[in-house]
């Protein structure tokens, strides 16, 4: 077979170049130690910031209880919709 002969001939003629240390050095990056983690700085550190947080007013939204109590029915949360079955022919 002609194709097989050409393939074998090319395989025998192939001479790979040996890899040198310079090739390996060019293909990789040198390893370096990562930077040490920094301690996060909080905005307004100190006792005065804590006191300000403690004295801050809490915002609360109140719903009117009368309308919600009238509209609530405990049986409404688990209702199946009735499906009309097609007539049998």
From Swiss-Prot:
Task: Please indicate if the UniProt record lists Ion transport as a keyword.
Answer: yes
User: Keyword Ion transport on this protein?
Assistant: yes
**InterPro entries per the UniProt record, alphabetical:** ATP_synth_F0_suH
Q: Name one GO molecular function term.
A: proton-transporting ATP synthase activity, rotational mechanism
| One Pfam family from the record | ATP_sub_h
Domain of life per record: Eukaryota
Q: Which GO terms describe its cellular component?
A: mitochondrial inner membrane; proton-transporting ATP synthase complex
Q: How does it sit in the membrane?
A: Peripheral membrane protein
Compartment list: Mitochondrion inner membrane
Keywords from UniProt, A to Z, are:
ATP synthesis, CF(0), Hydrogen ion transport, Ion transport, Membrane, Mitochondrion, Mitochondrion inner membrane, Transport
Q: Which family does it belong to?
A: Belongs to the ATPase h subunit family.
Known PANTHER family for this protein? ATP SYNTHASE SUBUNIT H, MITOCHONDRIAL (PTHR28207:SF1)
Q: What does this protein do?
A: Mitochondrial membrane ATP synthase (F(1)F(0) ATP synthase or Complex V) produces ATP from ADP in the presence of a proton gradient across the membrane which is generated by electron transport complexes of the respiratory chain. F-type ATP synthases consist of two structural domains, F(1) - containing the extramembraneous catalytic core, and F(0) - containing the membrane proton channel, linked together by a central stalk and a peripheral stalk.
Quaternary organization: F-type ATP synthases have 2 components, the catalytic core F(1) and the membrane-embedded component F(0), linked together by a central stalk and a peripheral stalk. The central stalk, also called rotor shaft, is often seen as part of F(1). The peripheral stalk is seen as part of F(0). F(0) contains the membrane channel next to the rotor. F-type ATP synthases form dimers but each monomer functions independently in ATP generation.
> What is the name listed in the Swiss-Prot or TrEMBL entry for this protein?
ATP synthase subunit H, mitochondrial
